[in-house]
Amino acid sequence: MQVHTLTIIAVVFLLAGAVKGMIGLGLPTIAMGLLTLAMPPSAAASLLLVPSFVTNVWQLWLGPSFGPLLRRLWPLLAGLTIGTLTGGLPALAAGSTWTHAALGMVLILYGLWGLAAARLPAPGRHETWLSAVVGYLTGVVTAATGVFVVPAVPYLQALRLSKDDLIQALGLSFTASTIVLGLQLRVTGTLETVDLGVSALALVPALAGMAGGQYARRVMSEKAFKRCFFVGLIALGAYMAASGWL
């Protein structure tokens, strides 16, 4: 692999890791969006496997409340597993272009809603069954499109978690989604072979960027974090919508 290609990979994953460290999501989208400017999409996708999985696990384990969050969110994880393995919608998968655009618009609208200081109502006493429903719907969308964020991310934000607990909850959801999606692809025979060695090269800058983003989050106030979180959702949604339409 040429030096300039390695440099591009390092810079892209450093940036993508920093964003993920700060707001808890966005690494695959940012990395794919930038890498495909310099290489084929298949090559870019092969680089994502190790950094995406490892940064999700790191995000999960470094948080302060793994046990309490696991006990609270197990219905969401159970629903996510069932939805991913059994609820994939062929119609969505066949129309993945417009589906990604629609999901992007949902994130944009939710981000604007959050910046306007409006909030989704907390689920309250309905949290257990609502978590299962949201998990199932997220699993269906994940199986059909490979997108983990809708509707899980808006729902987790509605639980009124602290910034560190929210980041850890996102890591829990994304890690589970990655594992179950991989299992679903393996079972259906659609899991493609990737070069783990090449993918591992991208892990170092991704972790370095993530560490920097985590430091920035630690020194942020809750208010500043929420602003960055919603702006990040808008940017992520805008990219998804644009890539779906163009």
Walk through the language-model features, giving the residues of each.
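Structural signature of hydrophobic alpha-helical transmembrane segments
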Residues: 5-6, 35-53, 97-107, 136-146, ...
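Hydrophobic alpha-helical transmembrane segments in multi-pass integral membrane proteins
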Residues: 44, 87, 91, 141-147, ...
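Selected transmembrane alpha-helices and immediately adjacent juxtamembrane segments
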Residues: 1-38, 120-170, 177
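Hydrophobic residues within alpha-helical transmembrane segments
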Residues: 11, 15, 50-57, 74, ...
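Juxtamembrane helix-boundary/capping and inter-helix hinge elements in multi-pass membrane proteins
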Residues: 38-42, 63-69, 157-165, 188-192
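Signature of the 12-TM Major Facilitator Superfamily
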Residues: 43-50, 101, 168, 172, ...
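Selective hydrophobic functional segments
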Residues: 47-96, 178-223
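Transmembrane helix exit motif
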Residues: 56-67, 88, 102-127, 214-215, ...
